[in-house]
């Protein structure tokens, strides 16, 4: 199942710099693990924002929820999810 996910990060301005560095490092490691596993095949930065657009390829809604809630930055994110379906006009490759 494919999902289009927008993640907007809102870290507190008064967050301790060492805490911020740690959480960002853990986020990078976890997201790269999911990318290597093929569950997070596309990741793009939104220009000028601390946000991204991603495509997840997972087996179920529950699996996606588990992966997203496991992100170290999850408590600081606004996340919007759109399930995707194959378009009938897509060129077959």
Task: Identify the role of each PLM range.
Residues 1-93:
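Conserved, structured core segments of small domains
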